[in-house]
């Protein structure tokens, strides 16, 4: 990846907010990373690739927004599942952008599962004076923000060079089980 274009957190949002495992839904079930990542992914897709972090910043709003249905996840899995090595995240993301272009779609999202954590990726093609390929990486342990990186048409091939290490710190890689097991499920 270009050293001039690393994923970054928005300065407009509070990266210290962590509601993972700290709030319950209306039925008293604890809301974990898998629930938050799934909700973020659905929110991203249903709002043209945009996220309003008001809900993700508030324990009360998040507990109202997410209703846990444990059986639901197994019935709503998308058709494609990828086992991805830490060094190969960019290849999968690049191919998803190519698929979006081919299908004339502007955005999609997918959940990312490691042995110890669930996260999400939102990708979108932003059509302005220069097409931008935008990647949003969401970690529920930073509930009210996401990391963002974009590439222009002239450097889209640089996406292939993205790795898990570009999005996650050494500490997170270890905590999420990605140091010992270098595969994620997309």
Language-model-derived ranges and their functions:
Residues 1-70:
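Active-site nucleophile-adjacent alpha helix/oxyanion-hole segment immediately C-terminal to the catalytic cysteine
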Residues 16-18, 109, 134-136, 182-184:
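Ser/Thr- (and often Asn-) enriched beta-sheet segments in non-cytosolic proteins
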Residues 23, 111-112, 127-128:
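A general structural signal for short secondary-structure junctions and capping/turn motifs
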Residues 43-115:
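Conserved active-site-adjacent core of cysteine acyl-enzyme catalytic domains
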Residues 114-120, 130-133:
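Short, surface-exposed coil-to-beta transition loops
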Residues 122-126:
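Short beta-strand micro-motifs enriched in acidic
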Residues 127-150:
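Catalytic Cys-His active-site segments of thiol-dependent hydrolases/isopeptidases
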Residues 143-186:
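Noncatalytic regulatory segments and standalone regulatory/sensor domains
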């Amino acid at each position: 990846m270009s050293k001039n274009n690393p994923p970054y957190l928005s300065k407009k949002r509070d990266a210290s907010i962590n509601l993972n495992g700290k709030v319950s839904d209306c039925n008293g079930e604890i809301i974990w990373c898998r629930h938050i990542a799934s909700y973020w992914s659905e929110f991203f897709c249903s709002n043209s690739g945009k996220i309003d972090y008001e809900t993700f910043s508030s324990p009360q709003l998040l507990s109202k927004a997410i209703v846990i249905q444990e059986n639901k996840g197994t019935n709503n899995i998308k058709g494609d599942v990828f086992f991805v090595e830490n060094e190969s995240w960019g290849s999968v993301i690049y191919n998803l952008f190519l698929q979006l272009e081919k299908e004339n779609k502007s955005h999609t999202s997918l959940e990312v599962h490691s042995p110890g954590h669930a996260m999400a990726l939102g990708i979108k093609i932003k059509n302005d004076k220069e097409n931008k390929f935008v990647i949003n990486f969401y970690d529920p342990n930073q509930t009210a923000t996401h990391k963002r990186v974009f590439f222009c048409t002239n450097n889209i091939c640089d996406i292939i060079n993205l790795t898990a290490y570009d999005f996650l710190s050494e500490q997170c890689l270890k905590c999420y089980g990605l140091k010992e097991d270098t595969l994620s499920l997309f």
